[in-house]
Amino acid sequence: MRTSQYLLSTLKETPADAEVISHQLMLRAGMIRKLASGLYTWLPTGLRVLKKVENIVREEMNNAGAIEVSMPVVQPADLWVESGRWEQYGPELLRFVDRGERSFVLGPTHEEVITDLIRNELNSYKQLPLNFFQIQTKFRDEVRPRFGVMRSREFLMKDSYSFHTSQESLQETYDKMYEAYSKIFSRMGLDFRAVQADTGSIGGSASHEFQVLAQSGEDDVIFSDTSDYAANIEFAEALAPSAPRAAASEEMKLVDTPNAKTIAELVEQFNLPIEKTVKTLLVKAVEGSAYPLVALLVRGDHELNEVKAEKLAQVASPLTFATEAEIRAVVNAGPGSLGPVNMPIPVVIDRTVAAMSDFSAGANIDGQHYFGINWDRDVATPEVADIRNVVAGDPSPDGQGTLMIKRGIEVGHIFQLGTKYSEALNASVQGEDGRNQILTMGCYGIGVTRVVAAAIEQNHDERGIVWPDNLAPFQVAILPMNMHKSYRVQELAEKLYSELRAQGIEVLMDDRKERPGVMFADMELIGIPHTVVIGDRNLDSDDIEYKYRRSGEKQMIKTGDILDYLVKAIKG
């Protein structure tokens, strides 16, 4: 490709509305342009990268035995009503009515469509297992699209769905998908972790997220410093302290704390160690409970894990925090003065709280706290559960090492769905015993457009993008200095350009009448891994300058050796 016949579209300045580095560089490198909020046009450079991601995903899905299909973006509302998600999904589901007054949605995902297809196409266990995938546009009406293509409304996704007659068969395919995903992200040159995850509203028995490690990530990735253990923040187990609870050394006393309505204020005003404080959060109880609310207690410096809390038998789902009015109706005190002593509703405490002694908590009286509280002396030990987020330095749940926390960008997610959709849509086949058998499902997604942004977040410097070799829009950039004035520069550039293309190497030759500084800046911004600079001065000694983008290393290579050097560097 020649720049004179190509839409380069690079920008010198960073657009003001671009928050994260991937969004900034995708705009500056001429990869995307914003059409409307959360909607982007992919320009030639961006599309070349996107297609490389697609191709790697498609190759590994084919290698894993998945079968490619293509399903409509527009889906009939009837299917969503039948599955129960018409009411459940929320405003992210874009709904519309056609001229015949029939209701439809723009697909954010395709569980309903694929399950409907399978229930009409398969009839026997002998046809299973099967795993179908597509790489296709999705639409989710995000309330606040942000970070460019990282969280857009329209995006490209690889979604696949497997069907089985047994849990053992599902597990086998799940393991294949786990391995395929690991190969996909490894081939892309990404630093990632496969982490155990909560199955959430999708349900099912197992789930893993694939997280690309990056400071701009929205997720906390938890992993051991010595083992393979990895999980997301919602799933990671916080073990109980190994040391026994210390004996009481203080008497409980009631203290006036009129200006301490938060843990931070209590700690500051009374010079307390935050590790000796407890915060109390009230949430709505499950329907039918004898009490309207449940009290959840975590240490002052810890955070409640809402996913874990929602799984408690006493707690309503979805987890809903009580309003101040609801709290006062039950406890007769405000949110800043709550604690376990004389709490008139069920109490669940975190494992760490159960190991505390001589701690401080609200007295359930406005403007007052108890100091020196001890379990079983001042208040009976209530139910104990793991309800907090882990923190760096906690022991790893697998017993090996301690936990570290880094930020991550979720680029893939695999689920064992079980029978949630097949039961709702009555997808069954005749089993080996002749009876109808509801199918067991797995689903596996990769955010294809998000992968592009995640790769940039992990691979950039002050000059621009530093693509992993397998994702770069071009493999080689040829920069002929003043080729329009020098016949020998032009002749050698054209020769090398043709030879590289004949080798199947993707090459961009900058044949613009531009200053060298502009040419260098654009190629570094775009992130092409290998650059060759052809100029009259170096040709006097039969040399060509070669530069590797990632290291910045430059070297002189003889004109007769440059082709072999590049072929070896690229193809190995």
From Swiss-Prot:
PROSITE patterns: AA_TRNA_LIGASE_II (PS50862)
GO biological process: prolyl-tRNA aminoacylation
Catalytic reactions of this protein: tRNA(Pro) + L-proline + ATP = L-prolyl-tRNA(Pro) + AMP + diphosphate
Cellular component, GO annotation: cytosol
Subcellular location: Cytoplasm
Keywords recorded for this protein, A-Z: Aminoacyl-tRNA synthetase, ATP-binding, Cytoplasm, Ligase, Nucleotide-binding, Protein biosynthesis
EC number assigned by the record: 6.1.1.15
UniProt main location, coarse: cytoplasm
Pfam families per the UniProt record, alphabetical: HGTP_anticodon (PF03129), tRNA-synt_2b (PF00587), tRNA_edit (PF04073)
Domain notes: Consists of three domains: the N-terminal catalytic domain, the editing domain and the C-terminal anticodon-binding domain.
Oligomer and partners: Homodimer.
PANTHER family: MITOCHONDRIAL RIBOSOME PROTEIN L39/PROLYL-TRNA LIGASE FAMILY MEMBER (PTHR42753), PROLINE--TRNA LIGASE (PTHR42753:SF2)
Family according to the record: Belongs to the class-II aminoacyl-tRNA synthetase family. ProS type 1 subfamily.
Physiological role: Catalyzes the attachment of proline to tRNA(Pro) in a two-step reaction: proline is first activated by ATP to form Pro-AMP and then transferred to the acceptor end of tRNA(Pro). As ProRS can inadvertently accommodate and process non-cognate amino acids such as alanine and cysteine, to avoid such errors it has two additional distinct editing activities against alanine. One activity is designated as 'pretransfer' editing and involves the tRNA(Pro)-independent hydrolysis of activated Ala-AMP.
Name of the protein described by the UniProt record: Proline--tRNA ligase
Organism for this UniProt entry: Enterobacter sp. (strain 638)
